Amino acid sequence: MGPTRPTPPRTPAVPLFAAVVRPLQAFLRLEAASGIVLLSCAVAALALANSPLSDEYRAFFDTTLGVRVGPLAAEFSLAMLVNDGLMTIFFFVVGMEIKRELAVGELRTLRQALLPLVAALGGMAVPAAIFLAFNAGTPAAAGWGVPMATDIAFCVGVLTLLKARVPHALVVFVTALAIFDDIGGILVIALFYGHGLQLTWLAAAGGLTAALALMSRSYVRSLAAYALVTAALWYALHHGGIHATIAGVIAGLAIPARARVSPRAVLRGVADHTAELLRAAEDEDLDSAAVLELEERIEDVESPLGRFVHALHPWVAFAIMPVFALANSGVDLRALEPAQLVGRLAVGTALALFAGKLVGIFCCTWIAVRSGLAPMPGGASAAKLIGVSAVAGIGFTVALFIAGLAYGGGTQLLDEAKVGILAGSLVSGVVGALVLRLTPRVSSRSPAPELSVASAS
């Protein structure tokens, strides 16, 4: 009889912290890559709009499409399909991410949510005030909601490139802040950028919203079922005078965020089922039904919201948002007078994004920390807080979206606003990155929360 082999040491269990952080790591990697794709599409749109192909570029997105179902018919441009149709899916994912953070994520308790909420309020109020200081009393004042948003894809992309100098807690803080920014932007779109409210259609929309709530309470897990009701809600809101993309947000908030069965109970069932399979004769093949049952038990751990986000997020990050950037970032600078490039609308928008976000977020956060309302995320220095506050001034996707609602397509005001959005976002990203680059490296980083580039509202 040979010598007894020593029992290998047991591998320690994965810390709970690592298990919680891994989904956030995946989210951050996805957003970082999406930022690169978004930037490429924005540059391509600007290049096309200022090239000999500018007429073809505009004509392509003005292409008229049509749909007919029996006696019902509709015509719309390709730009409308992107802005009103595909962006509904974008806002659907935004709605789900908001619900996930509020239900099981970083914003699930008041203490966790308080600091990013205060920072977000400052980061929305100060930019709006600066914008109105430049444009009050003019037709451009309608775009006061433009500089309120933070583009999470670009923002996290910049922070990812500087991961050695940004504490992970500060990245989580900025992500939570952007979630509140999204909520603010959604409320602004719903309340201030509608047109001619029609109570009959809004009543129908209310009924469909109640249907979504009932589906959530009944734990409906079919994405197709939610899509069908959301399409009807989109139609009702469109005719009711509220921007139809809000249907995506409402649907996203209705998706169940928790598993129906507790993960512990599911895992216990999986363990028992696996033990039964292992007790079977070794020469007995596992039939497909047994394997399928095991897969179904494992699927019960994931909530419908988690499953839908996992399925749709790559499409939003790498298809819908880049197509939106390609359709909406093109500004023919040759058609604008020099005075318009440095006019009140363009400069007001750029300053509102850069200075407004920087001052609003930094001051509100600093006051909240100094007053003992909440601790500084990761014990970050004032310089690091200044850096991330500046980076949060990158407002792109939702800012362009609100500008389109405020000024309408193809107008000179819209082009001036786009110049301001692009300039303000560029300055915010560059200045924020330079400030963070000059700060000391983070002394100790756990491997779990590391940000690495592997990318959406």
Curated annotation (Swiss-Prot):
An example of a GO molecular function for this protein is: sodium:proton antiporter activity
Q: Which GO terms describe its biological process?
A: regulation of pH
Q: Does the keyword Magnesium apply?
A: no
Which residues does UniProt call coiled coil?
A: none
Which Pfam families does the entry link to? Na_H_antiport_1 (PF06965)
Membrane topology value: Multi-pass membrane protein
Report the GO terms under cellular component.
plasma membrane
What residue intervals traverse the membrane?
A: 33-53, 76-96, 114-134, 142-162, 172-192, 196-216, 235-255, 308-328, 349-369, 385-405, 419-439
Q: Which reaction does it catalyse?
A: Na(+)(in) + 2 H(+)(out) = Na(+)(out) + 2 H(+)(in)
The protein's UniProt keywords, in alphabetical order, are: Antiport, Cell inner membrane, Cell membrane, Ion transport, Membrane, Sodium, Sodium transport, Transmembrane, Transmembrane helix, Transport
Location in the cell: Cell inner membrane
* UniProt cross-references to InterPro entries, sorted A to Z: Na/H_antiporter_dom_sf, NhaA
Superkingdom of this entry's organism?
Bacteria
Gene3D superfamilies given in the database record: Na+/H+ antiporter like domain
Stated family: Belongs to the NhaA Na(+)/H(+) (TC 2.A.33) antiporter family.
Question: What PANTHER family does this protein map onto?
Answer: NA(+)_H(+) ANTIPORTER NHAA (PTHR30341:SF0), SODIUM ION/PROTON ANTIPORTER NHAA-RELATED (PTHR30341)
Q: What does this protein do?
A: Na(+)/H(+) antiporter that extrudes sodium in exchange for external protons.
| Name of the protein described by the UniProt record | Na(+)/H(+) antiporter NhaA
Please give the organism: Anaeromyxobacter sp. (strain Fw109-5)
Q: What is the lineage of its organism?
A: Bacteria, Pseudomonadati, Myxococcota, Myxococcia, Myxococcales
